Amino acid sequence: MGNSTSLFQRLVNTFIIAMQEPNKLTKETMLKIAIDKQYVNVVEYLIRKRVNIVNCRNSYNPLISAIETENEEIVNLLILNGASVNELSHTNNTPLHVAVDKNIKP
């Protein structure tokens, strides 16, 4: 029984690490896909599993992606869980710049 628990823990840990890795073809992380598809429950799950929500690989900024989808619930989830509102994108824009560019009103 102890062996199966250990195996289970290793599988879970491997899965958590894999969640951070971008897809080899699309270069997108699970978080990026969930944000783009606006799967709030998946974003919540990934946050609970402590995936990186600040700045991911390939200069991808999850908060900026959420702002671009105009999904206020995901934007709030990310901010409440530590996403930086000052983190720059690969084009040197902050999330506020992106919101203004999209003409998003408070």
Curated annotation (Swiss-Prot):
Q: What is this protein called?
A: Putative ankyrin repeat protein FPV241
Which InterPro entries did the record assign? Ankyrin_rpt, Ankyrin_rpt-contain_sf
Organism of this sequence: Fowlpox virus (strain NVSL) (FPV)
Q: Which UniProt keywords apply?
A: ANK repeat, Repeat
The UniProt record lists the keyword rRNA-binding: no
Matching entries from Gene3D superfamilies are given as: Ankyrin repeat-containing domain
List residue spans for each ANK repeat.
26-55, 58-87
Superkingdom of this protein's organism = Viruses
